[in-house]
UniProtKB/Swiss-Prot annotation:
Keywords: ATP-binding, DNA replication, Nucleotide-binding, Nucleus
Native organism taxonomy: Eukaryota, Fungi, Dikarya, Ascomycota, Taphrinomycotina
GO CC annotation terms, alphabetical: chromatin; DNA replication preinitiation complex; nuclear origin of replication recognition complex; nuclear pre-replicative complex; nuclear replication fork; nucleus
Family the entry assigns: Belongs to the ORC5 family.
Protein purpose: Component of the origin recognition complex (ORC) that binds origins of replication. It has a role in both chromosomal replication and mating type transcriptional silencing. ORC binds to multiple sites within the ars1 origin of DNA replication in an ATP-independent manner.
One MF annotation (Gene Ontology) recorded for this entry: DNA replication origin binding
Underlying gene: orc5
One Pfam family matching this protein: AAA_16
Name of protein: Origin recognition complex subunit 5
Gene3D superfamilies, per database record: P-loop containing nucleotide triphosphate hydrolases (3.40.50.300)
Species whose genome carries this gene: Schizosaccharomyces pombe (strain 972 / ATCC 24843) (Fission yeast)
Record's keyword annotation contains ATP-binding: yes
Subunit structure: ORC is composed of six subunits. ORC interacts with cdc18, recruiting it to the ars1 origin of replication.
Length: 455
């Protein structure tokens, strides 16, 4: 396939990427001058991978695709490349675990090929051991190892400046799609637009059906466009989800496709329905939460359970209320707080009655659980732990710190400290488990969690 033919075919399959298609075709698929290495970068959902795969499918060029998210170490990375180019598994495992052995085996394998091969390193910036040295070694590999029939393609999400250094490599940038481009792509890639009636016959012309799809795309962009953040895949998933519901009145024969006003009115009704909002906000039914929690066992030590409850209280209670909740009286009993039982637990907002000095304005009190968890210092966590645990569970402070580290490794509490801690700084954490999970732990400890939560 000639170069201009490849460009034309790519433009028919990949929309709104004319500049990137032209650069990619000239740098990679021009047989007279192919670059040894090239960088494609841009945020997610910008057609980097899709354009590459489409170009390889149309040109029938040999390519080796390595996703760096599936590689754990550099040795595993070398091993996967060698296996893809035809090196024996045992030889690759024994000799290809370092850079010198990898280059030797790769050179031997590529010398047996009389055709050009493209090595695609997808999401290399997500590789745990990615570094400037590794990037430099790979970028100069075709030249240093004298492998003229090899080109390396780096696909990144972030800017390649931190990896390039002083290297001179061709870079192709994939910007985020604009609103007009996303709508253009959606309108050029419609789903099946045959509006079949109940008898199975198509009763409308193709132009009318396409017009309905274009109106639908514009309508949903006005509703979900801001939330999708110019992400084509996110917006397309929304389109595919609500499309059957949108055309249901047309299929049932209740509305003509040209009656856009009535279609939009019905669409607004189901977009704001309880079922739709619940699905959009990922709200789980309380019964499903209970069944999910009952099916899970809490395999934590007694100290870890008390620490997790303490972390939850420290995240959702203001520090000024610690003395009220966790101080001891003369009888060595925790004061706690006698809370009034709320009849409707689903109410999150309660208005304060108006007074004469409020000038007609009403304040709104928001629950701490609604505002979300807040960071706390580790000293405050330990103080609450010693206040709520019984004397039997009060172990040494060193063991408590070990259990805190365990909870942090399990991602049940997350570090909230900014930057590098200085010698006098106190580590800060934030709880990362749900209220339902902590309630189950508190029930296993016979601890009245709700009595120690601020309203």
């Amino acid at each position: 396939m000639h170069l201009y033919q490849l460009e034309d075919e790519l433009k028919k399959n990949v929309f709104c990427r004319e500049d990137q298609i032209k650069k990619l075709s000239c740098l990679l698929f021009n047989k007279d001058c192919r670059v040894p290495s090239i960088v494609l970068y841009g945020v997610a959902s910008t057609a980097k991978t899709f354009l590459l795969r489409t170009a390889f499918d149309l040109s029938k060029e040999e390519n080796v695709w390595i996703n760096l998210q599936d590689c754990f170490t550099v040795a595993h990375f070398w091993y996967r490349i060698l296996i893809k180019v035809g090196v024996d598994k045992d030889i690759a495992l024994k000799k290809g675990i370092n850079i010198s052995g990898f280059i030797y085996l790769l050179e031997q394998a590529m010398s047996k090929r009389d055709y050009h091969t493209f090595l695609v390193l997808d999401q290399i910036d997500d590789f745990a051991e990615a570094s400037t040295i590794l990037f430099s070694q790979l970028a100069q590999l075709p030249i240093v190892a004298n492998i003229p029939n090899l080109s390396i393609i780096f696909v990144l999400h972030s800017h390649p400046a931190q990896y390039l250094g002083t290297l001179s490599i061709a870079v192709i940038f994939f910007p985020q799609y604009t609103q007009a481009e996303i709508l253009e792509i959606c309108q050029k890639t419609p789903p099946n637009l045959d509006f079949l009636d109940r008898s199975g016959d198509s009763v409308f012309e193709d132009e009318i059906e396409l017009s309905v799809w274009m109106q639908y795309c514009s309508f949903l962009w006005s509703v979900f466009g801001v939330q999708c953040l110019n992400d084509y895949r996110s917006f397309r998933s929304v389109l595919d989800r609500y499309w059957p519901k949108f055309i249901q009145p047309i299929v049932e024969g209740d509305i003509h496709p040209a009656d856009y006003a009535q279609l939009h009115k019905l669409a607004k009704n189901f977009l704001v329905s309880d079922a739709t909002v619940t699905k959009r906000l990922h709200i789980i039914n309380p019964t499903e939460i209970k069944n999910l929690l009952d099916s899970k066992s809490i395999n934590l030590s007694l100290v870890s359970k008390y620490l997790l409850v303490s972390a939850f209280l420290a995240s959702y209670n203001p520090s000024r209320l610690d003395a009220q909740f966790f101080s001891f009286s003369k009888t060595s009993k925790r004061r706690g707080r006698k809370r009034k039982q709320i009849q409707d637990e689903g109410v999150l907002f309660s208005k304060i009655p108006r007074t004469a000095g409020s000038k007609g304005r009403s304040a709104v009190k928001i629950s701490q659980l609604t505002l979300g968890p807040k960071p706390f210092e580790v000293e405050r966590l330990i103080a609450i732990y010693y206040a709520i645990s019984s004397p039997v569970e009060k172990v040494l402070t060193a063991d408590v710190f070990v259990q805190i580290a365990t909870l942090a490794s399990l991602k049940m509490i997350l570090s909230a400290s900014k930057g590098v801690l200085r010698s006098l700084d106190s580590p800060r954490y934030i709880v990362n488990v749900s209220r339902e999970y902590v309630l189950k732990i508190a029930d296993s400890l016979s601890f009245p969690l709700d009595s120690y939560l601020a309203g």
